[in-house]
Amino acid sequence: MAPQMSQKEADIAMMLAAGCHLGTKNVDFQMERYVWKRRADGIHIINLGKTWDKLMLAARVIVAVENPQDVIAQAARPYGQRAVLKFAQYTGAKALAGRHTPGTYTNQKDAVFAEPRVLVVTDPRTDAQPISETAFVNIPTIAFCDTDSPLKNVDIAIPANNKAKQSIGCLYYLLARMVLQMRGTISPANPWDVMVDLFFYRDPEELEAKEQEEEETAAAAAAPAADAGYNAVADAAYGAESWDDQAGAGFGAQAGNWSEAPAPTGWDAQQGGDFGQGFGAMPPQGY
């Protein structure tokens, strides 16, 4: 019997399956310490052991904030928007998905002004504006950093693949679970009843195509059941025989009269006949 994996080993196996270890061909000089090796094709492999340690550190920082609403998770990248919304749903934090409004953390007259205690971003490149703003107001920043990500103004860098939708969803899932475990909301001994698939990005076009395919399959399955008592062959034969009998009889009756002169009908039959008979029967008068 194989020994049971520890929580860290199970999490690393999940991150491997999600592709969190795959970096890029470029490496920032500050990210070299998190790179394990370089593949033959030039892709750098991230050390997931250090990724797990940084996830634990980030979870401790988030748990230290008394009010969960003072934590903001932000993602401008489309693949990370669903993940930050799910992270905020389960941890009680706020989520900002989509384009960042300049001045959100620095302009107090802005309608969307916010003063978080901790900021969590998905990519230091696409989320460069909120990182630069939080640096002005001394807000700690946690960021998922790839091998080519700049670490300027980033306080806690979590080395991982921040470009794939499975990787981003897995990272936010693990971070949310660690936060809930440290708060005592869920027990570390029991598995979390939330699936990691809920944090993955879903393409609206793929969902629409899938729903349409399911509807077509259901309609095709219901069609034979509705027509089970209908015999198309017998109905076609009956219709053909009835049409032949009726059309043939009428056609034959009309065909036999083709050699005869057509009988007058309408005004000619009534007026013409009476006029001929009356003219022949009247005797000449006045001659």
Curated annotation (Swiss-Prot):
Record-level GO BP terms: ribosomal small subunit assembly; translation
Kindly state one GO CC term assigned in the UniProt record: cytosolic small ribosomal subunit
Please provide, alphabetically and separated by semicolons, the GO molecular function terms listed in this UniProt record: structural constituent of ribosome
On whether Isomerase is a keyword of this UniProt record, the answer is no
Q: Where found?
A: Cytoplasm
Signal peptide (from-to): none
Q: Which InterPro entries match?
A: Ribosomal_uS2, Ribosomal_uS2_C, Ribosomal_uS2_CS, Ribosomal_uS2_euk, Ribosomal_uS2_euk/arc, Ribosomal_uS2_flav_dom_sf
**Entry-linked Gene3D superfamilies:** Glucose-6-phosphate isomerase like protein, domain 1
* Alphabetized UniProt keyword annotations: Cytoplasm, Ribonucleoprotein, Ribosomal protein
This protein's superkingdom? Eukaryota
Q: Region Disordered: what ranges? A: 249-287
> Pfam families recorded for this chain?
40S_SA_C, Ribosomal_S2
Chain's role: Required for the assembly and/or stability of the 40S ribosomal subunit. Required for the processing of the 20S rRNA-precursor to mature 18S rRNA in a late step of the maturation of 40S ribosomal subunits.
Family according to the record: Belongs to the universal ribosomal protein uS2 family.
Could you identify this protein by its name?
Small ribosomal subunit protein uS2
